[in-house]
């Protein structure tokens, strides 16, 4: 955009496909040139950017260029803080479609310095008394929020993201839910190694989200976007890579069923709003999936502990179709193993008694029964 003291200005020209621009017949005046591009806020922005910005804020891995500092300053206050993460996460989750205090792009003048404390840049070229052609009046395009450089434009191909085969695999247990019932659905780890973050869109067919609770992963309402009754988005970013044992509860979804259904009929992941992907410790991009565990036809069944909650003692029971070995493990909400019992289970009903003194903790615990290919997890609560 070209500005001048003349009443015929400002004038605007569109750049060519390769990013060049040309203005003519403007001799003899003093001009100011700026560049701008609106919209497309989410282009190049993902939870991977949140991971990198978090590491920068905590001093674990600094952003390696001043242009990336401009990109990370999402709320345009001259510094990179947790507030920038909040604005970008809402964008990623689909809660907002624009940044409230910033444009989608900034265009520092090429060759000018970028201030870092506070973050500032020169976005205007001034030409006094133009009397001859001026060439190489260039700007640097900075996509706000995109610190890993994967924005897609017509000028340059985006930086190729490193792909990983280390995908995030999670699962939930099959169960029947009655119409109007509010249930807790633990999301457990199937393959969860060296994970720095993930994001996805979840469809809840015939159900609505009530809340989300932490397990191994510290999550809260800020990690979730409720787009509609049936569509929920999630974004999780960690400053350090997370490992979780198979069967460990990563987090728990609380949902309300609008009709009678099975969990397998209700939950599925896709990229409808927030693209489904994961990131490992090397910041490589992989897939994220959510499976549904079904009990084998033989009919092993793990029951809810009784009583629950409990103060002194509780009993965990399970049904076995045949005599077999089984492992009953108790975890805390971080995934740390509290106790493990190796059991020579008999055909029929088996019961194990746990006391508060044996467990040595209070609050929320999870217990998992494993026998052959069967795995099931339930929650117990110890009160003071």
Task: Annotate each predicted stretch with a short phrase.
Residues 22-30:
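Short Pro-Gly-centered beta-turn/loop motif in secreted/extracellular proteins
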Residues 185-189, 314-320, 354:
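Aromatic/hydrophobic beta-strand junction motif of beta-rich domains
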Residues 6-22:
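Short, acidic Ser/Thr/Gly-rich low-complexity loop/linker segments typical of extracellular
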Residues 315, 342-373:
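Short, surface-exposed loop/turn motifs with a glycine/proline- and acidic-biased composition
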Residues 305-306, 330-338, 365:
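Short, glycine-anchored, charge-dense loop/turn motifs used at functional sites
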Residues 344, 380-384:
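Short beta-strand edge segments in extracellular beta-sheet folds
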Residues 75-77:
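Acidic carboxylate motifs that coordinate Ca2+ or other divalent cations, activating on Asp/Glu
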Residues 6, 30, 41-44, 51, ...:
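Acidic, low-complexity intrinsically disordered segments
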């Amino acid at each position: 955009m070209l500005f001048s003291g003349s009443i015929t200005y400002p004038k605007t020209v569109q750049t060519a496909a390769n990013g060049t621009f040309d203005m003519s017949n403007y001799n003899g005046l003093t001009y100011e040139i700026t560049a701008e591009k609106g919209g497309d806020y989410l282009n190049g922005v993902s939870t991977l950017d949140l991971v990198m910005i978090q590491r920068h804020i905590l001093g674990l891995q600094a952003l390696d260029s001043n242009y990336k500092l401009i990109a990370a300053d999402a709320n345009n206050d001259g510094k990179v803080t947790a507030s920038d993460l909040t604005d970008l996460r809402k964008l990623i989750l689909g809660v907002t479609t624009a940044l409230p205090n910033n444009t989608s792009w900034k265009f520092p003048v090429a060759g000018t310095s970028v201030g870092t404390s506070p973050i500032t840049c020169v976005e205007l070229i001034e030409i006094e008394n133009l009397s001859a052609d001026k060439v190489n009046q260039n700007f640097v395009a900075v996509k706000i929020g995109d610190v890993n450089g994967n924005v897609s434009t017509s000028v340059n191909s985006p930086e190729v993201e490193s792909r990983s085969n280390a995908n995030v695999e999670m699962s939930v247990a099959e169960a029947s839910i009655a119409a109007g019932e509010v249930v807790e659905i633990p999301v457990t780890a199937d393959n969860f190694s060296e994970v720095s973050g993930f994001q996805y869109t979840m469809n809840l067919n015939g159900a609505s989200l009530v809340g989300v609770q932490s397990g191994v992963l510290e999550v809260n309402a800020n990690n979730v976007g409720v787009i509609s009754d049936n569509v929920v988005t999630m974004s999780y970013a960690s400053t350090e890579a997370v490992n979780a044992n198979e069967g460990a509860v990563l987090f728990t979804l609380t949902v309300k069923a609008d009709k009678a259904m099975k969990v397998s009929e209700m939950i599925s992941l896709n990229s409808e709003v927030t693209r489904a992907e994961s990131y490992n410790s090397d910041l490589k991009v992989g897939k994220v999936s959510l499976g549904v565990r079904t009990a084998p036809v033989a009919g092993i069944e793990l029951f809810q502990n009784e009583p629950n909650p409990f103060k002194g003692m509780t009993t965990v029971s399970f049904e076995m179709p045949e005599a077999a070995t089984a492992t009953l493990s108790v975890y805390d909400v971080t995934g740390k193993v509290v106790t493990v019992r190796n059991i020579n289970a008999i055909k029929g009903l088996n019961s194990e008694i746990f006391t508060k003194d044996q467990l040595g903790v209070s609050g929320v615990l999870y217990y998992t029964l494993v026998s052959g290919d069967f795995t099931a997890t339930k929650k117990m609560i110890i009160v003071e």
